[in-house]
Amino acid sequence: MRYGAVEAVRNLSLSVAEGEAITLIGPNGAGKSSTLKGIMGLERSSGAVSYQGQELKKRTPESLAAKGMVLVPEKRELFASMEVEDNLMLGAFTRFQRREKGLRDDLERVYALFPRLKERRKQLAGTMSGGEQQMLAIGRALMAKPKLLLLDEPSLGLAPLIVGEI
């Protein structure tokens, strides 16, 4: 991954098995966020990115989401002018398209993990605290029932007790 003349990530190879958790640790500017964005096709990269044996280089972020790949970006990227519950349901957009059942049950599971979101389900996302927005971003990702979940700075703004739960 390059930013002009600066090479942010070089010679990186990752392999993640089903059910496995991998952590990228490094100082600011080491390329952790760039790596996640490169995997999701949000930043151009050289080399190859494959998932379940398929090359992803020419895929759109939307098609990757439909394959079950979800990124919770560092800056949350919520729909600030929409209510909490609407943000959560947008996380399940591809499931709506497939007419999947169980969305309400999954919403209740997210509310059980983050009770504060249920209390504030009619509140505009942009008016919430940073920690509440982080809960919402993670909850929205979980609504997609991801096969591959990429979390960039997942504990940002969260209380230590909630970090332990996640």
Q: What is the predicted function of each stretch?
A:
Residues M1-I166:
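Glycine-rich phosphate-binding loops of nucleotide-dependent enzymes
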